[in-house]
Amino acid sequence: MAEVSIEKLAADIGTSVDRLVKQFKDADIVKAANENVTEDEKRQLLDYLSKQHGGTGSEAPKRMTLQRKTTSTLNMGKSKAVTVEVRKKRTYVKRTDVEEARLAEEETARALAEQQAQLEAEKAAAEEAKKAAEEKAKKAAESKAKAEAERLARAEKAKKEAEARQAEESALSPEEKAEQERVRTEAENIRKKQEQESQRKLEEDAKKAADEARKLAEENSRRWKEEEERRKKQEAEEVHVHSNRYAQEAEDADDIKIERGGRRRKKSKRNAGSDLKHAFNKPAQPVERIVRLGETITVSDLASKLAIKATEVIKAMMKMGEMATINQVLDQETAVLVVEEMGHKYELVNDNALEDELLADKISSELASRAPVVTIMGHVDHGKTSLLDYIRRAKVAAGEAGGITQHIGAYSVETDNGRIAFLDTPGHAAFTAMRARGATATDIVILVVAADDGVMPQTKEAVQHSKAAGVPLIVAVNKMDKESADPDRVKTELSQLEVISEEWGGEHQFVNVSAKTGEGIDALLEAISLQAELLDLKAPPTGSAKGIVIESRLDKGRGPVASVLVQEGQLKAGDILLCGIEYGRVRAMRDENGKDVAIAGPSTPVEVLGLSGVPVAGEDALVVQDERKAREVATKRNAKQREIKLAKQQKAKLENMFANMEAGDVSELNIVLKADVQGSVEAISDSLTKLSTSEVKVNIVGSGVGGITETDASLAAASSAIVVGFNVRADASARRVIEAEEIDLRYYSVIYSLIDEVKMAMTGMLAPEFKQEIIGLAEVRDVFKSPKLGAIAGCMVVEGTIKRSNPIRVLRENVVIYEGELESLRRFKDDVQEVRNGVECGIGVKNYNDVKVGDQIEVFEIVQVEREL
């Protein structure tokens, strides 16, 4: 494997960069976060972590118990015999366990002795080297002094000789002078060489003594290490290899006797030893396995594929710095690291191979023109459904609760310009997911904006959805029949969202329409046809169908019903349809008017019956040829979703511990939610979850499509939840449970009412809040002494009212010096309940006698404040 940076390695194993850098530093590897690490450095880190956490090797049994049973027959006479059975049980304790203390003491003593011997040897060598160096230095100094004396003597002698030679040279010839000079030079050179040789010998002797001392210390250290390694190796062999000799010596002659026909025979010691031989043979080399890894795998499944216990995998992950549980789901990268760490090989597999195979089996045909799919989007009450209603010549808006659309309505309309498929999306803020789903399934978006209302929050959201999906936008300015209509204002506000009309030099068509009078409807249909021609929409008209689930619900009489928009191919009755984790054979298809349809082509919305369950809205719908493959894919998707859900529910993470501890004081409002269609369940769940605050949390303990059943009521009773039904009702068995358990059951048909009432319920769960409100202030004018009550303050009420039963504060120079309660309140000699502004009174403060003239007595009351979300 190539070198990787510490940041990449930390991301792969799922730990922080700072922690990994610290672990490298502890292992004597100093690295920065952006530096690379080699395989040797990673192995060194793993060795260090392994030493820190301890080994995982298996131990041999510490004791062994042998049981022997011998049977003999005792003759009591000619015709009577008694069977005698002798049972013997012996326990053998492993020698290393019995002598563990003694061996440990001997080993400690031996180690100390060796260490002491090594220290003494090093000390002796150092002293010897020091003595040798001092002696040689002394000899060198003496030699130097002697040489200096000799040099001075020679110099004096040479001086005399030079003077004598000078006297002689004056009488010598030039040849004789040259010969004398040569002899003198040679003598000087010989003397210098002798001095250099003696100095070199002194240095070599000192160096040799130091080397001998160092080698002696190294030899002692090496022998001590070899002895330590030999001892450890011997202990390891004693732990893992069992000798037959001890078992043979432990068995005596009585243990190997058997009785056969009244005669006793002894087994040979060779046979006895063979019976006691250990049956397990140590593997000659490590077993290396090849593990097939998908996108996710649980710890228990990974251990099963490695043929080891799950605890071994958890230990390996702990050594890598990752905490895990036996049911935790690991991603592919983490699983690869664990497999490599444990010395095995891996093979990556594609979890979607079966789905890819289904797509490859799809029957396709040549492309042909298809009708456009148009989604009508906009703010609530801007007239989207009324506009579509006028086009369809039917009354749809009147059937929606509260006059607002709460489902995606899919309609196919025949116009003079050809067939058009319309999708009507809700405009309420809670239906964001449904609007986004409509934008991804559409070709053209019609943005309906009321001319008298302008751009609203959901209008902006619709523009964002269309831009994100890359779908062309046509703006329909509705309600032009009203006097307050102002289309120019709509253009101005939309231009701020980068939606500019063609009249202003942009690329978006603006059409003024009125859903009430029909004004501009034809122009709108022409704009749709023109935009569809520019897009040149095509799809295969025959072959295997493919589409998207627009909406789904559970019908009491017909079972799961899914609204499917066919995008390509032909969907026929009898086809096997796969929608997410649900599948089934299409039993019947119906259009938006409830009429049966035999074949549905591209851009045709139909209701499909016959699925195994209610599919999730927004899932792709695909016709497959083999029902068995469809079942396999659905089962695999379901298992994958379950693993993802399980991974989200992991609460054993250390980083979540403190968050869970802090959340202990948060109140929870549990809700069991049932709605008529899947889209409403999603929208209501998201809206209610967003209502959660730091003090009150909304918890959806159960949700689903269809009526309220006995199971839902039991779940609500067990979790102390309220049951909310949106356009659904409870059956008879559920009502019985609800009445018996006194569960709060509420029905709604408009999402506004549902959210408002849940808000009110959450407000009632808020902890009460109190505040102090000052109701009166009295100034101390004089202080009197009372034998019963102590100091009595003669006061004048300067603000508000002084009440007897309320708490007070004593202020001196506007600083609170005491807080307590009134013990006595009198007007003249009479006890009174309250004294108003401008009236004198006597006040006795309970357990406080240090009242002085000029102090102020402040009276307050504690008032509960109504909390709001």
UniProtKB/Swiss-Prot annotation:
Signal peptide: none annotated. Residues 120-241 have a biased composition (Basic and acidic residues). GTP binds at residues 378-385, 424-428, 478-481. Residues 478-481 are annotated as: G4. Residues 378-385 are annotated as: G1. PANTHER family: TR-TYPE G DOMAIN-CONTAINING PROTEIN (PTHR43381:SF5), TRANSLATION INITIATION FACTOR IF-2-RELATED (PTHR43381). Residues 514-516 are annotated as: G5. One of its GO terms (molecular function) is GTP binding. Residues 403-407 are annotated as: G2. Residues 51-78, 105-277 are annotated as: Disordered. Residues 424-427 are annotated as: G3. One of the essential components for the initiation of protein synthesis. Protects formylmethionyl-tRNA from spontaneous hydrolysis and promotes its binding to the 30S ribosomal subunits. Also involved in the hydrolysis of GTP during the formation of the 70S ribosomal complex. It comes from the Bacteria. Residues 369-542 form the tr-type G domain. It comes from Pseudoalteromonas atlantica (strain T6c / ATCC BAA-1087). It is found in: Cytoplasm. Residues 67-76 have a biased composition (Polar residues). Transmembrane segments: none annotated. This is Translation initiation factor IF-2.
